[in-house]
Amino acid sequence: MDNCIFCKIAAKEIPAQTVYEDGEMVCFKDINPAAPLHLLLIPKVHFDSLAHAAPEHQPLLGKMMLKVPEIAKASGLTDGFKTLINTGKGGGQEVFHLHIHIMGTPV
């Protein structure tokens, strides 16, 4: 997507403090954190929200969910963490590219 800031981060057109990346997803620090540690995990492929996910996204979404605890632990969130997916304007979503918030206080 041409105007999607998260697509631009995934394509390395905009810098971000990346903490994890593979061929399908990238995780970076939120520039406006709501917790001492606030990360965003995004798929490199664009779809607006969880409500826009298609059956072919199921393997990717599963991989992302399983990657969350690994990223949290590697980032120092060893005493627990919170995950959040805002979906749609009414659900508080501000950037319309699916993303998983990973938040907590590093130990």
Swiss-Prot record:
Q: Which CDD domains match?
A: PKCI_related (cd01276)
Q: Where is the HIT domain?
A: 5-107
| Single annotated GO MF | catalytic activity
> At which positions is motif Histidine triad motif?
97-101
Name assigned to this protein: Protein HitA
Provenance organism: Neisseria gonorrhoeae
